[in-house]
Amino acid sequence: MIEADRLVSADSSGAEEAVDRAIRPKLLAEYVGQPQVRSQMEIFIQAAKLRGDALDHLLIFGPPGLGKTTLANIVANEMGVNLRTTSGPVLEKAGDLAAMLTNLEPHDVLFIDEIHRLSPVVEEVLYPAMEDYQLDIMIGEGPAARSIKIDLPPFTLIGATTRAGSLTSPLRDRFGIVQRLEFYQIPDLQHIVSRSARHMGLEMSDEGALEVARRSRGTPRIANRLLRRVRDFAEVRHDGSISADIAAQALDMLNVDAEGFDYMDRKLLLAVIDKFFGGPVGLDNLAAAIGEERETIEDVLEPYLIQQGFLQRTPRGRMATVRAWNHFGITPPEMP
């Protein structure tokens, strides 16, 4: 199983990215959810503008699909500057980063997605650029090689990562602002779904938006993807308008249940319950039982189930919680 093939995957495809870009909020006033992040960024941005400074370097981390790229775009728009976008894997050589840095205008934003994947060589170039707005470049080779310093305009680096723990300490410590994005609450997701529906020219009831939001795993990217598939269903099977009943029919047909679980989520939970009596079960046995790689279980399937309280990871193995038993209408065994 490939994570990107799942309807409830938080990862993004290139085509999807282009569609989502059109419906993203452009300013903090339009930004829904993440109230602490929003209120803090309002102050930091306003203070930087009052002083006439570039905003401090910003690190944004959290699960995929929660709006790290959206927030970077909002920062650039609020500051009234250009946004230059790249990613850690793309910056293979020090020269790749140097080319981007030397093309920045004063106060511009450089956004590096997947910043935890920067190579050590590129990261070393970034340190003086972040601290002193200087670029150290080696000219020539061998004994004749010499270092020259190039002054850079003040700029803001925004780094985004799903794995903050993978950042080196020297890099992490150079960010003046660090923001963590959390899974969204259902009312906020409902607002996002309604807003996206309006952008798409859809007739959708509040209850229909709520039904999509409930099944979106706390993630705006998934909410927008489910909305597009519900739209298809409504246009083909009905008159195009989306009620709660139409949304539920569409998502049931797509095998996304009331908790936002798909076939693979349910397969894993039912294996623990039916084949291993609720657990504990070792990871290798569980992987063999459902025909998946252990890495897929650890990195793709487990995190959301654990976060929502349906699965426990214990020293003896994985266990289904009472909530998991109840989800399938199965009576959990009596505890000894």
UniProtKB/Swiss-Prot annotation:
<comment type="function">
    <text>The RuvA-RuvB-RuvC complex processes Holliday junction (HJ) DNA during genetic recombination and DNA repair, while the RuvA-RuvB complex plays an important role in the rescue of blocked DNA replication forks via replication fork reversal (RFR). RuvA specifically binds to HJ cruciform DNA, conferring on it an open structure. The RuvB hexamer acts as an ATP-dependent pump, pulling dsDNA into and through the RuvAB complex. RuvB forms 2 homohexamers on either side of HJ DNA bound by 1 or 2 RuvA tetramers; 4 subunits per hexamer contact DNA at a time.</text>
</comment>
<dbReference type="InterPro" id="IPR008823">
    <property type="entry name" value="RuvB_C"/>
</dbReference>
<dbReference type="InterPro" id="IPR027417">
    <property type="entry name" value="P-loop_NTPase"/>
</dbReference>
<dbReference type="InterPro" id="IPR008824">
    <property type="entry name" value="RuvB-like_N"/>
</dbReference>
<dbReference type="GO" id="GO:0005737">
    <property type="term" value="C:cytoplasm"/>
</dbReference>
<feature type="binding site">
    <location>
        <position position="69"/>
    </location>
    <ligand>
        <name>ATP</name>
    </ligand>
</feature>
<feature type="binding site">
    <location>
        <position position="24"/>
    </location>
    <ligand>
        <name>ATP</name>
    </ligand>
</feature>
<dbReference type="InterPro" id="IPR003593">
    <property type="entry name" value="AAA+_ATPase"/>
</dbReference>
<keyword id="KW-0963">Cytoplasm</keyword>
<dbReference type="Pfam" id="PF05491">
    <property type="entry name" value="RuvB_C"/>
</dbReference>
<feature type="binding site">
    <location>
        <position position="23"/>
    </location>
    <ligand>
        <name>ATP</name>
    </ligand>
</feature>
<feature type="binding site">
    <location>
        <position position="69"/>
    </location>
    <ligand>
        <name>Mg(2+)</name>
    </ligand>
</feature>
<keyword id="KW-0233">DNA recombination</keyword>
<dbReference type="GO" id="GO:0016887">
    <property type="term" value="F:ATP hydrolysis activity"/>
</dbReference>
<dbReference type="GO" id="GO:0000400">
    <property type="term" value="F:four-way junction DNA binding"/>
</dbReference>
<feature type="region of interest" description="Small ATPAse domain (RuvB-S)">
    <location>
        <begin position="185"/>
        <end position="255"/>
    </location>
</feature>
<keyword id="KW-0067">ATP-binding</keyword>
<feature type="binding site">
    <location>
        <position position="221"/>
    </location>
    <ligand>
        <name>ATP</name>
    </ligand>
</feature>
<dbReference type="Pfam" id="PF05496">
    <property type="entry name" value="RuvB_N"/>
</dbReference>
<feature type="binding site">
    <location>
        <position position="65"/>
    </location>
    <ligand>
        <name>ATP</name>
    </ligand>
</feature>
<dbReference type="GO" id="GO:0006310">
    <property type="term" value="P:DNA recombination"/>
</dbReference>
<dbReference type="InterPro" id="IPR004605">
    <property type="entry name" value="DNA_helicase_Holl-junc_RuvB"/>
</dbReference>
<comment type="subunit">
    <text>Homohexamer. Forms an RuvA(8)-RuvB(12)-Holliday junction (HJ) complex. HJ DNA is sandwiched between 2 RuvA tetramers; dsDNA enters through RuvA and exits via RuvB. An RuvB hexamer assembles on each DNA strand where it exits the tetramer. Each RuvB hexamer is contacted by two RuvA subunits (via domain III) on 2 adjacent RuvB subunits; this complex drives branch migration. In the full resolvosome a probable DNA-RuvA(4)-RuvB(12)-RuvC(2) complex forms which resolves the HJ.</text>
</comment>
<dbReference type="GO" id="GO:0048476">
    <property type="term" value="C:Holliday junction resolvase complex"/>
</dbReference>
<feature type="region of interest" description="Large ATPase domain (RuvB-L)">
    <location>
        <begin position="4"/>
        <end position="184"/>
    </location>
</feature>
<keyword id="KW-0227">DNA damage</keyword>
<comment type="similarity">
    <text>Belongs to the RuvB family.</text>
</comment>
<feature type="binding site">
    <location>
        <position position="313"/>
    </location>
    <ligand>
        <name>DNA</name>
    </ligand>
</feature>
<feature type="binding site">
    <location>
        <begin position="131"/>
        <end position="133"/>
    </location>
    <ligand>
        <name>ATP</name>
    </ligand>
</feature>
<dbReference type="GO" id="GO:0006281">
    <property type="term" value="P:DNA repair"/>
</dbReference>
<dbReference type="GO" id="GO:0005524">
    <property type="term" value="F:ATP binding"/>
</dbReference>
<keyword id="KW-0238">DNA-binding</keyword>
<feature type="binding site">
    <location>
        <position position="70"/>
    </location>
    <ligand>
        <name>ATP</name>
    </ligand>
</feature>
<keyword id="KW-0378">Hydrolase</keyword>
<protein>
    <recommendedName>
        <fullName>Holliday junction branch migration complex subunit RuvB</fullName>
        <ecNumber>3.6.4.-</ecNumber>
    </recommendedName>
</protein>
<feature type="binding site">
    <location>
        <position position="174"/>
    </location>
    <ligand>
        <name>ATP</name>
    </ligand>
</feature>
<feature type="binding site">
    <location>
        <position position="294"/>
    </location>
    <ligand>
        <name>DNA</name>
    </ligand>
</feature>
<dbReference type="InterPro" id="IPR036390">
    <property type="entry name" value="WH_DNA-bd_sf"/>
</dbReference>
<keyword id="KW-0547">Nucleotide-binding</keyword>
<dbReference type="Pfam" id="PF17864">
    <property type="entry name" value="AAA_lid_4"/>
</dbReference>
<keyword id="KW-0234">DNA repair</keyword>
<dbReference type="GO" id="GO:0009378">
    <property type="term" value="F:four-way junction helicase activity"/>
</dbReference>
